[in-house]
């Protein structure tokens, strides 16, 4: 007797025009990858346009469940010090802050979708160098931490395991959850 089980799922991918943020000429961050990757995936038939979605809104409460009010206010009011701005690696602007909020919104939606449908991804997700009180390494808000905290706070799961395959440690994520046994990084 042969038993075949097929699990069919539809991959959802968070994507927004905000993700490819304009940077100064010769900036070292490869922002264009956020336009090139989805275009290539559709071109080669890996996904269809129906797999792509534009993230919705994220509440301040979702952000403040992870980030300090002082830091988030400084981001929104564009009042980081020059040193704090340099640490992020990006020139601070209103559109950049909108981009970071949109990335986190996409990761929250992907996490919820993955819980019920198996798999989802955010083209620009993985902002794991952002700490609760500061940005670092091209990361202003920690989307992984925001999504994890959202899933736990809404009772959608009790624990989260973050498997970070980046060559650099997700130091911001590790710091945010260092005393929280509900999230393992």
Sequence positions of predicted segments:
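HDAC/HDAC-like amidohydrolase catalytic core signature
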Residues: 5-185
């Amino acid at each position: 007797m042969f038993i075949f089980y097929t699990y069919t799922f539809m991959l959802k991918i968070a994507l927004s025009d905000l993700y490819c943020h304009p940077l100064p000429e010769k900036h070292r961050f490869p922002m264009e990858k956020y336009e090139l990757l989805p275009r290539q995936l559709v071109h080669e038939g890996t996904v269809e346009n129906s797999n792509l979605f534009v993230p919705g809104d994220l509440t301040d409460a979702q952000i403040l469940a992870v980030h300090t009010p002082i830091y988030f206010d400084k981001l929104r009011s564009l009042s980081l010090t020059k040193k704090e701005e340099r640490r992020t690696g990006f020139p601070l602007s209103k559109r950049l802050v909108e981009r970071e909020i949109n990335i986190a919104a996409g990761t929250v939606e992907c996490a919820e979708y993955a819980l019920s449908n198996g798999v989802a991804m955010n083209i620009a997700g993985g902002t794991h160098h952002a700490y609760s009180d500061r940005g670092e390494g091209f990361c202003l808000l920690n989307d992984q931490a925001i999504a994890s905290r959202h899933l736990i706070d809404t009772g959608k799961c009790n624990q989260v395991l973050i498997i970070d395959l980046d060559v650099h440690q997700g130091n911001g994520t590790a710091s945010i959850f260092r005393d929280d046994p509900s999230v393992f990084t």
